Amino acid sequence: MGKNKLEKFADMASYPHVFEYPYSAVDNVPFDMKGKWHKEFFKNDNPIVLELGCGRGEYTVGLGRMFPDKNFIAVDIKGARMWTGATESFQTGMKNVAFLRTNIEIIDRFFAEGEVSEIWLTFSDPQMKKATKRLTSTYFMERYRKFLVSNGIIHLKTDSNFMFTYTKYMIEENGLPVEFITEDLYHSDLVDDILGIKTYYEQQWLDRGLSIKYIKFLLPQEGELREPDIEIELDSYRSYNRSKRSGLQTSK
């Protein structure tokens, strides 16, 4: 029999590689690990990579296995979902993986300047109604700048044509360097080990015949960031665990 939510929450609270700081607690509880992830937790100087909106955490666990010379931190607010990856990494003794349960809106409170090298955004909610909630919006780019190294790498992997198109326009509007871009990752010319990692939800979308889009771009520290002023056609389908789209056909 699988564990219920309360049992999963109890496990999460006991795991040494899980840090739980929901929005309601952050103002009252100082986060001592900020600026000390390398020294105090990972105990090495390997690059730190974040996965924001990690869901079950399978992608972080997969990356951790694939790249033992990097440190990975999976971030999400849903503790019961994160339990899957947190439990697997704990039981297998992985030392280069951690989990942070918090709201991504306050992610800059947990890392010091230049402490993070890369960010993965895997199947983020496209937030078609409000640009500032999109994890590739300039609102979030400014937050990432507070802790990402200059020209740090950002990976977007998505089934959403809306999210992919919006991110392309955001990149173009701000002249951000693009290292790779494709509208169909598994039929592209990209040769990379990351192709071997598929999350539970990603496989569902592939089974439904949806193509997976991918962008790898850099975020310089300098330069004012501007939001793209363009209407984008909304996704015509309802992705797993996303709220139903509105009656609108386009959005900025």
Swiss-Prot record:
Binding site for S-adenosyl-L-methionine: 51, 76, 103, 125
Signal peptide: none
Residue stretches spanning the membrane: none
InterPro entries: SAM-dependent_MTases_sf, tRNA_(Gua-N-7)_MeTrfase_Trmb, tRNA_methyltr_TrmB_bact
Pfam families referenced in this protein's UniProt entry, alphabetically: Methyltransf_4 (PF02390)
GO molecular function: tRNA (guanine(46)-N7)-methyltransferase activity
Catalytic reactions of this protein: guanosine(46) in tRNA + S-adenosyl-L-methionine = N(7)-methylguanosine(46) in tRNA + S-adenosyl-L-homocysteine
Binding-site list for substrate: 129, 159, 199-202
Active site: 125
PROSITE patterns in the cross-refs: SAM_MT_TRMB (PS51625)
Pathway(s) the chain acts in: tRNA modification; N(7)-methylguanine-tRNA biosynthesis
Annotated keywords: Methyltransferase, S-adenosyl-L-methionine, Transferase, tRNA processing
Record-listed E.C. numbers: 2.1.1.33
Database matches in Gene3D superfamilies: Vaccinia Virus protein VP39 (3.40.50.150)
Gene Ontology cellular-component annotations: tRNA methyltransferase complex
EC top class, as a word: transferase
General function of this protein: Catalyzes the formation of N(7)-methylguanine at position 46 (m7G46) in tRNA.
NCBIfam families: PRK00121.2-2
Record-linked HAMAP family: tRNA_methyltr_TrmB (MF_01057)
Family: Belongs to the class I-like SAM-binding methyltransferase superfamily. TrmB family.
Name recorded for this polypeptide: tRNA (guanine-N(7)-)-methyltransferase
Organism in which the protein naturally occurs: Bacteroides fragilis (strain ATCC 25285 / DSM 2151 / CCUG 4856 / JCM 11019 / LMG 10263 / NCTC 9343 / Onslow / VPI 2553 / EN-2)
Gene name of the record: trmB
